[in-house]
Design a protein with these regions (language model features):
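Carbohydrate-interacting regions of secretory-pathway proteins
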Residues: 1-119
Length: 119
């Protein structure tokens, strides 16, 4: 099942349903405006906020999922026939270095996650 909106979805092709979490509340995404996303990635824990709402909080099993201590960060959009005319732009990207165990800087109250079992 596709998410209501792809903004903030955790896309993971190895997951049986393709998405670890999905944004199921369309009102969180601002259409044709700037949206603010925040990612917390510390060790094997990943949290994502969209416009102040926690969309997902997942701790990946390090026995199954490779955790890199260094490398590149990718920001992407997937195109396709269903997304003709879609435009994506990014501004004010800040990357902050944190230490293992540092807590997230925002409250974690998941409002949109649909639980999806990881492989």
């Amino acid at each position: 099942m596709m998410p209501v909106t792809l903004s903030g979805a955790f896309y993971y092709p190895q997951c049986p349903t393709t998405f670890v979490w999905k944004n199921v509340d369309e009102s969180i995404e601002k259409k044709n405006e700037w949206n603010e996303g925040q990612v917390y990635a510390n060790g094997n824990r990943i949290i994502f906020w969209l416009n102040g709402y926690t969309l997902g909080d997942e701790t990946l099993d390090p026995k199954v999922h490779r955790i890199s201590k260094s490398g590149n960060i990718g920001i992407q959009v997937h195109g396709g026939d269903q997304f003709k005319g879609m435009q994506v732009a990014f501004q004010n990207i800040d990357i902050l270095k944190i230490k293992p165990g540092d807590p997230p800087s925002m409250p974690v109250v998941v409002v949109c996650k649909e639980l999806v079992p990881l492989p």
